[in-house]
Amino acid sequence: MKKANAWSLALIPCLGLWLGAAPVWGATAPPLSEVRVFKVESARCTETIPERAQSTQMCTHRGPTKVSVMEVGLGNNPMGRFNGAELNGQRTPVCQVGSISEACSGAGTLMGYIYVFDLNVQAQGWFEYSNTSINGPRNTLKTLLNIR
């Protein structure tokens, strides 16, 4: 019989602490099923973006601009870009609590994320967001929006 290595034994409590600190959502992770831009905010205006829209319509966005993306399901490779340049985004988990979707606060089932990306828009350009599902069918979803 092979003796256990001290290093491998030391990993067990570390893994237990790591797993114990992870949130328990109580359900299988839903596959990524939708990504879309739902809001663009700048000093000139805030506009709600309808489904399947290809461009902003209400105003010409310039300067500091926030782009909000809704992601239904869970992915593991979120990527936001404006005119090809990678962006950093803030994400907020969204949970289903009964029939209501809300920011997670320890109750409900994790159903996706809201990402907010900060841009500095100098001229019209394309915002792109993509992510790949963490489980079957491991599909990659993408949304594009022309920001005028």
Provide a role label for each language-model segment:
Residues M1-L11:
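Bacterial N-terminal signal peptides that target proteins for export
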Residues T60-R62, G108-L110, N120-Q124:
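Surface-exposed coil/turn segments at beta-strand junctions on protein surfaces, enriched
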